[in-house]
Each structure stands twice: as C-alpha cells, then as structure tokens.
C-alpha cells in the first residue's frame, strides 16, 4: 500500500523534520518538535524570496551527534527549514511519480502510514516478524550473503535521483531545471550547500531519496536473487556459495552505476543454518521476569547480568535491551534502585541516558535532589565529548527536575 500524499506532507513537516528515526524517539527530548509546522505555515515560508548569494550557496544543516551502543557517535542533521520545506512540497507535488517506492518488497524501511503520524521509522522489526521471514526465506538455502553500502547517505549523489526516477538516458538528455525530476534534485542540493554529494542523515526526506535510488537497483537484483534490504544493509539467501558471491558482485556493479560502493569490512558470506537471535538475547530473556513487577533486589541482579554480558559481547546493545525491558515493570521503590544503578552506567554508556526519563519522573521530589550532582557531572562529561543527544536529554532532565521547581 502506498502512502497518501496529504498524510505524507503532514508527516514530513510535523513529524519527520527532526532526526527522530526510532520508534521511541530517543534521539531528542520531546521539547524538540515541529508539530506547529503545518501546511499553511510551510506555504508561507516557501514564498520567502532568496537573495542571489543564498540561491548560489544553498543552505547548511545543524550537525547533531547521537551515541551508539559501542559509544561511537553517529552524525545526524537538522536541516534548514526553508530548503527542507521546498523538498517536501516537490515530493508532494510529484508523489504519483515517486510513490512506487512504498511497494518495494525487498525494502524493510520505506514510507508507510504509521500511527504516530510519521511516515518513516527506522527501527528493526518485531522478533516474530523476523522469525517468520527467516523460516520462509532460509528454507532450502545454504548460505547468507551480507553486504552494506559504504557511507550511504553522505555518498548519495543528488543527480542519481533523476537517474533512478526516469532512467540514465532520459535524465541526461533532459537537464532543464523545469523538469520535475531535476526540481527534486535541485532542492536536495540546496539543503546541502548546493553540493551534489550527500543528503542530510535523519529527516525522512533523506530516506525517500535513498529509497528512490536503491529501489531502482532492487528492480534489477530481485530478478535473480532472494534478498532483503534494511536501509543500506543487504541480506541474501543463496543455494550455493557461488550464488552468494555472484550476488555481491552484481550488487557492487549496480551500486557503482549510481556512484555508490560496498563497505568491504561488512561484506561476508556465512553458512546456514544461523541462529535467529544472538546468544545474549536468550540469556537476558531467561533472567528478566515476564509480566511481573520487578522489586528492588531484582533490579541489581538483572543489570549485573547485563553488565557481565556486555563485556563479553561488546558489539551488542545488551545494557539498553535490559534497561528497556524492565523500566516499565518498576514500582516506586525499585524505580529508586533502578535510577541509582542506571545513573552510574550512563557515565560509561551514554546511550542509556534517554531511558532515565520515566524512572526520574517517578522518583519522589525529595529524593530527586540527590541526583543533582550526578546529572551535572554527566552534563559536563557529555559536553567534553561533544555528545549532542546526551547533552540535550540531560539538560531536559535538569530543567524539569530542578530549575523548573525554582520558578513555581
């Protein structure tokens, strides 16, 4: 099913402007929102005339760093509203020529109609969906081919968008800015200082640009291979090792047509069968009680186990999994224990900071004062390491828990 153009525009303007890619919106505190950027407001902004210099130089984005489970930062972007709005309306105006990307069976992340009002959510699928797909795709196959595009969004060539939309020949023979596909290309360039290389990482418009190009590649590859794609990450199910090698070879050839390349470090062929989930997932499921309120003494047992497993599996987001699994099962007493333990872990694993939101809110006001020092130290540490997301969340907590109380 395709996305309706009115829903799409509303989602792009009001829900998918900020880099809120995950279902839980953990990249930014809720104070960051574009909910007031309605179609009417956007139309007024779109009418603003630009100077010659601004048209020539384009616009830049605000760089925003989010921390991954291995503490390696990921660079996201908050685009300038003017060129972003221009892109949204160009996609809206020509959605009939673009909406086919919603029907791509090989892509797991594409524009959809989500209940949250967003059109793009870049989360991994539910475990039961993952299992069902594995049972279906892996039957009769002996090998998995894994491949990943190197620096996909920063490397995406803006001219590749027209190539994918109307074909190489037609795009290269019709270069007028009045052509609808070139209008989209031009708007994306304006969002990135009029450069042809790279699109902002984070807003849904970038996912749409990526899907336009990669859907065209999928059309060619799906004729011969059985595979799925999670944004820029490919998994092919193959009968022979030779077929797996051929998939990687063909994928590389198709990508190069659009000036994209494979990430050699993430290209691999593995023999089936493979476990559906990592070993640590099963271990954590054994430890965490199902549908039970977690008491204070159990909190430390669960988080202790997660710390030990994290050390053995540094590439897994075990602590985040454990914390998210129990945060909604706490009572008032265990919330205090959880907050104390998680606060200490946040100093070493800042990816956990957004999870503090709920337990901090439950902690009694008198007890919350004891976290003032910890929050200040975490803010200082996050500033020193230029952790944008951590600083935003911590300042949000600090203002809500302490400064706001001084004003009322």
Language-model segments: which ranges?
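General structural signal for secondary-structure boundaries
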Residues: 1-10, 80, 228, 256, ...
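Conserved two-metal-ion catalytic palm core of "right-hand" nucleic acid polymerases
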Residues: 1-178, 183-201
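Short acidic (Asp/Glu) and glycine-rich catalytic loops that position anionic groups and cofactors
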Residues: 65-68, 280, 373-375
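Short, surface-exposed, charged/polar-biased interaction segments
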Residues: 104, 108-115, 168-174, 255, ...
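Conserved polymerase palm-domain catalytic core
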Residues: 132-231, 236-248, 292-408
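Polymerase palm active-site segment centered on the conserved acidic dipeptide of motif C
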Residues: 241-301, 308
């Amino acid at each position: 099913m395709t996305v309706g153009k009115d829903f799409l525009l509303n989602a792009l303007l009001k829900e998918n402007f900020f880099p809120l890619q995950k279902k839980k919106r953990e990249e930014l505190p809720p104070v960051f929102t574009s909910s007031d950027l309605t179609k009417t407001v956007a139309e007024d902004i779109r009418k603003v005339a630009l100077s010659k210099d601004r048209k020539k130089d384009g616009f830049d984005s605000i760089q925003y760093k989010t921390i991954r489970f291995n503490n390696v930062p990921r660079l996201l972007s908050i685009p300038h509203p003017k060129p972003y709005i221009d892109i949204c309306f160009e996609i809206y105006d020509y959605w009939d020529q673009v909406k086919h990307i919603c029907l791509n069976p090989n892509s797991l992340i594409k524009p959809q109609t989500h209940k949250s009002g967003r059109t793009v959510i870049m989360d991994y699928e539910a475990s039961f969906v993952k299992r069902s797909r594995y049972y279906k795709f892996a039957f009769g196959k002996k090998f998995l081919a894994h491949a990943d595009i190197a620096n996909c969004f920063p490397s995406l060539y803006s001219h590749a968008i027209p190539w994918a939309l109307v074909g190489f020949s037609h795009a290269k023979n019709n270069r007028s800015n009045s052509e609808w596909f070139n209008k989209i290309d031009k708007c994306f360039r304006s969002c990135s200082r009029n450069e042809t290389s790279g699109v902002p990482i984070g807003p849904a418009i970038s996912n749409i640009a990526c899907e336009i190009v990669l859907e065209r590649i999928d059309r060619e590859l799906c004729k011969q291979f059985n595979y799925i794609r999670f944004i820029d990450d490919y998994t092919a199910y193959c009968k022979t090792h030779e077929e797996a090698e051929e998939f990687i070879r063909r994928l590389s050839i198709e990508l190069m047509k659009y000036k994209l390349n494979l990430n050699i470090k993430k290209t691999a062929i593995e023999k089936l069968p493979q476990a559906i989930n990592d070993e640590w997932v099963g271990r954590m499921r054994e430890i965490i009680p199902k549908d039970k309120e977690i008491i204070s003494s159990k909190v430390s047992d669960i988080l202790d186990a997660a710390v030990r497993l994290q050390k053995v599996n540094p590439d897994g987001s075990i602590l985040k999994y454990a914390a998210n699994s129990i945060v909604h099962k706490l009572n008032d007493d265990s919330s205090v224990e959880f907050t104390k333990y998680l606060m200490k872990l946040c100093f070493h694993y800042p990816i956990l900071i957004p999870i503090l939101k709920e337990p901090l809110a439950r902690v009694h006001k008198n007890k919350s004062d004891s976290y003032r020092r910890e929050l200040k130290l975490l803010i200082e540490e996050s500033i020193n390491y230029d952790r944008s997301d951590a600083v935003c969340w911590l300042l949000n907590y600090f203002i809500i828990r302490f400064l706001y109380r001084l004003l009322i």
